[in-house]
Amino acid sequence: MRLEKTMTDMGRIGETPRGGLTRVALTDEDKRGRDQMVAWMREAGLAVTVDQMGNIFGERAGAETLPPVMMGSHIDSVPTGGKYDGQLGVMCGLEILRTLNDARTRTRIPSRSRSSRTRKARDSSPR
């Protein structure tokens, strides 16, 4: 249920009257979505970083210092994109990390949820 609520809440940012969304990279809606993603990652206790391209990473430590397992996608959309355009991969990654935390599961390998913007920023930004 939590994943469904997270998907619904993110889907409201940039929602269109016909049920889709427009959350084009580098717009106010994109910023609102990215700010919400950072807030959820911090609420989940993840160490949040943003790289020079604007990719957001939420990392959960592992028992050993190893390269992290990474999962994610993008939360921006093309104009009039589908409600789940890209965000499912990001939200599933976040939900997996939340669930591991809820169960107090200590993993050997660090885990990282990623919200990417590099490809979509090129494809969907206003010209």
Residue spans for each PLM region:
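Acidic/His- and Gly-rich active-site-bordering loop/insert found
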Residues: M1-G82
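Acidic/histidine-rich catalytic neighborhood of metal-dependent amide-processing enzymes
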Residues: V78, L88-R127
